A protein has these predicted regions:
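Residue-level signal for inorganic ion chemistry
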Residues: 15, 43-45, 71, 105, ...
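Conserved, helical-rich catalytic subdomain that frames metal- and/or nucleotide-binding sites
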Residues: 145, 150-246, 261-274, 279-293
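Short beta-strand scaffold segments in enzyme catalytic cores
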Residues: 17, 41-45, 139-143, 149-150, ...
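Short, basic/glycine-rich phosphate-binding loops at helix/coil junctions
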Residues: 50-64, 112, 134, 207-217
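Contiguous, small/hydrophobic- and glycine-enriched helical/loop subdomains that border
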Residues: 109, 113-150
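Glycine/serine-rich anion-binding loops at beta->alpha junctions
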Residues: 91-120, 138, 244-260
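ATP-binding N-lobe of GHMP and related small-molecule kinases
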Residues: 1-100, 118, 122-127, 154, ...
């Protein structure tokens, strides 16, 4: 019987994010293109005698109160589904910054679901895990399988796309966050400013054109987020001035990323930026990875 499992929880960016309007349930209808990237957290799950324990590293990493933590939520939702106990100790090693729009919380929940399913031999399908995961976060279903996909609804209705041409991403995040609810509230007050579309990005991916993909990057939430956190706009401008083929904010921010054609250009830009978080990444064709069991 396996006693412990270790997994990679991969971050994501949104190549395009189009807000289609508010929904009666308080969420927003979206059309977006997700892409998994090589930045990741590590989730280690170990069987325990009873209960649930979460240890977050490094000490002081901001993950919020336990009852709002996505790892805890994923565990609770799975125990409710199977109507049984899953006593574990979870160690979460954070590398993906929180409040960045990079899917850190969602990917942690995704890895937790995959890990619990394997550790306890639950034999749930990916489709069942994705359905459970939606209760922990709108991006969890994508983060389970990862790769490249169009997301609709709140992002949970997924259609796979061809992987992008090889490239490097420089991901940067300012110190300040803005908060999803605050961003959407500001967006709703400025309706009519929609500029982004997923169509050029989908076309570029199907044609395998990196230049067209980079030119098509866009996010309807960037203007309002930039008003709340001006560093977002500044980072985007710095990345473009450094020679990026294209740049935009990911998700609800406040992380900004840029596409570069070569690793050398990306590394040079990484060294030149003064943001608190800067990382060179690559697109990857998968979601959660089991490292050890």
């Amino acid at each position: 019987m396996t006693e412990r499992i270790r997994l990679q929880a991969l971050a994501k960016v949104n190549y395009a994010l189009e807000v289609l309007g508010a929904r009666p349930d308080g969420y927003h209808e979206l059309s977006t293109v997700f892409q998994s990237i090589s930045l990741y957290d590590e989730v280690e799950i170990e069987r325990a005698d009873r209960g649930f324990e979460l240890v977050v590293e490094p000490e002081g990493a901001e993950t919020g109160p336990l009852e709002k933590n996505t790892v805890y939520k994923a565990h609770r939702l799975l125990t409710e589904l199977i109507r049984g106990r899953l006593p574990v100790r979870v160690r979460l090693r954070k590398r993906i910054p929180m409040g960045a729009g990079l899917g850190g919380g969602s990917s942690d929940a995704a890895a937790t679901l995959v890990g619990l399913n394997e550790l306890f031999g639950l034999e749930l399908s990916d489709a069942e895990l994705k359905e459970v995961g939606l209760g922990a976060g709108a991006d969890v279903p994508f983060c389970i399988g990862g790769g490249t996909a169009v997301g609709r609804g709140v992002g949970e209705v997924l259609s796979p796309l061809p992987p992008p041409p090889p490239h490097h991403l420089v991901v940067a995040k300012p110190a300040a966050g803005a908060g999803t609810a605050r961003i959407y509230s500001a967006y709703d007050k400025r309706l009519g400013e929609k500029k982004s579309s997923v169509a050029p990005v989908v076309k570029a991916l199907r044609e395998g054109s990196l230049g067209t993909l980079a030119k098509g990057l866009g996010n309807d939430l960037t203007p309002v987020t930039s008003d709340l956190v001006p560093e977002v706009r500044k980072l985007e401008e710095e990345l473009l001035c450094a020679g990026a083929l294209g740049a935009t904010m990911s998700g609800t921010g406040t992380a900004v990323y840029a596409i570069f054609g070569s690793a050398a250009e990306a590394r040079t830009t990484e060294r030149s930026l003064r943001a608190p978080f800067v990382e060179v990444c690559e697109p990857v064709a998968h979601g959660v990875v089991i490292l050890e069991r």
